[in-house]
Amino acid sequence: MGRLTVLKQIAHDIACQFGPDCEVVIHDLKTKDPENSIVYIENGHVTNRGIGDGPSNAVFDVIRHNNNKTQDEPRDHAGYLMKTSDGKILKCSTSYIRDDDGSLHYVFGINYDISRLRSEEHTSELQS
């Protein structure tokens, strides 16, 4: 079973576990055009992206500045907050998957829309 097949299975399971507010996306960095790197996505409505779209600006900057000469960069980043152009608050994690030779191949991202959770928390505080 290939690496991408395994990543797709994991992505699907995570999306099923956490529901429609959880986007899970896989980028293939070996494509000719990194701005069209999405090869798999679950719940793309969270960021309004689909197959063939590109990474977020933050991930794109990391990819563009990586020279693939060190195993230490870029580093995975878990639990950071992002705000979408339409105002959603996302809690995100990004993992950089390397080939056996150490070169970047995939980016595995989890983007969880916590806007509703924050709104419900705020509402319950107001009602207290």
Show where each model-derived region lies.
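Short, extreme N-terminal leader segments that mark the start of a protein/domain
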Residues: 1-32
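Residues that form generic nucleotide/phosphate-binding pockets
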Residues: 13-17, 62, 66, 123
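Short, solvent-exposed coil/turn segments at beta-strand boundaries
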Residues: 19, 30-33, 87, 100-102, ...
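Structured interaction and signal-relay segments at domain junctions
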Residues: 21-78, 85
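Sensory/regulatory domains in signal-transduction proteins
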Residues: 62-120
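Conserved small/polar residues in nucleotide/adenosyl-binding loops
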Residues: 121-127
